[in-house]
């Protein structure tokens, strides 16, 4: 399953790492997952497990093996990471393994374009520099 927000609300539900402390929310979300779900609305990469755990990529050496357990994977964001790392974030799925990857890009160029766009607030570009 691939969604932007969550399996329960595919377009716009936020699921943050700290939501693992809200067991009711996690249980309800996982009720919609058959096995694996990939999402990214919060732009914070990591793996959510059905037993209310969240693993940031660095906690799992940037790899996670898929098995019979239901998981929800936040792939992060190519253009607007929000985990404090300004590099682009994505995942590679190969066989039964997910690998989190980061690549450098020049957020300063994107920030300048956002600042030049009258309909956008400057903070949208400024936060790219810090990955927030």
Where are the regions a protein language model picked out?
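Conserved catalytic scaffold of divalent metal-dependent phosphoesterases
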Residues: 1-38, 42-53
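Acidic, His/Gly-rich catalytic cores of divalent-metal-dependent hydrolytic chemistry
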Residues: 50-132
